[in-house]
Every structure is written in C-alpha cells, then in structure tokens.
C-alpha cells in the first residue's frame, strides 16, 4: 500500500511505501534569513512532518542536501550538527544546485524507515 501525506496536484509532502517514508524536498519559510537560519527552519519542518507520520529524526536513513552555494556548507552544518543526535547521523550527500527560488539557500530531502 502507498500512503500520500498532504498530497497536491504536483507532489505530496511525504509518501509512505514499503516500510519507508520519503519526504519531498523541504525549503525554508524564512527566505531572507542566512543559511544557518534557513537550515534550522527546514530541519524544524522535517521534524514536524516526521511527527505527523509518527516518527522522529532518529528514523532518518538517508538525506540529500541541496545548497544554492557551496560557500554556505559550514553555515548549513552549524544548524545540522546541533540537530543530529550523536551516533544517529544518516547517510548524507550535499550538492550544489540552483534552487527554484533564488532566495532559498538550502533544500533538504529525507528518507526515513518506519
């Protein structure tokens, strides 16, 4: 069975299938903020969506982080390192990509295990 969370015409915020939860790329609600604050905002959104499906960040198995500018790598990691619990870091890739809104500095896509 496939379950779609907060579906819209173009995408669902999350999809549950085969024991995994796939979150769509999460983007900041505070586009005028710096990369650290934008990252913290996105991570809070991830926490909220995981809570909605009955999970916590400890269940995250894979993450892809898109940065508009790799110069923000350390600033992004400042928020990330405060958020990830010791010994619970998921597999992760961080890449530079042009994001849909030029004010966004970060987008994060997550896969978690049920």
Regions found by a protein language model. Give the residues of each.
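Short, polar/acidic, helix-capping and beta-turn segments at strand->helix junctions
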Residues: 1-114
